[in-house]
């Protein structure tokens, strides 16, 4: 049993969301009173934000389970990115700059899509959700890393560690699913342009995005429960800058075979299914582009897929480097910096790629700037 009596008793007192309720209010106000695009977003936007805000409740349950499991460890020590004091300031400045660009880029992209009627299509709706996922994922890891940079002992409580594990796994699954959904959307747009409105109706878009969010939260919760159901009674030092599932398994002093099998099965299933959807979509897209007689049509189709292909290459390339390298060349320091790229850099690059390389996004931004300039006159 994953849940103990103690954790079940405490369920009724966990009413307030872990994150600030203003996020929910912002989301409701943000998407209210819009016509075309709001019909595509509102049915699930509030529910998604509320589920994300209440994600900490899941981690509180995990925390109560760990307490009832009589773990001797009440906190973990993170070694951080580096122990060199001279490099700490450099890392802090770089991480802070990246996080600010990530927040500005992704939130700005969401606002731009919201206020631009020409971007109120399923493709940009999915892009809006990818921007939200990237901002959420970066916010799960980066702020705590910045706070810990100059601390001598980079300790993190059991509850905060559970929150990070739950949040990071949720983010990883969301990213995989959003990239898969966007690949299918591009397949329909390029291979069946005349049937796009029929094959990508509003109801289907809502179902795909909502199911992605719900599935991601469930996977994050289940994996975190399995992790903190184990007993931690020995070493508590994690050679990482955030609470990661794999190093935590190595610290457990109870049987980890079930957790390891669960991690391998769920992660393998998610990556395999996502990769299959992406590969099949782009195989059909490639055949469709080859059959096009117009050079302009080919260029337009390629530009539609270029940004998404770059995001997929970065994401799966980093995963391959982190988990599929030979043991002989395996290094914890390499894993650490690959994790920086995976959790911090990619969310920033996605917002830049989809804004700077997308002609429609740039045109929408130019129109808004021109409108603001004319209003000042």
Mark where each language-model region is.
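Transmembrane helical core of 7TM receptor-like proteins
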Residues: 1-377
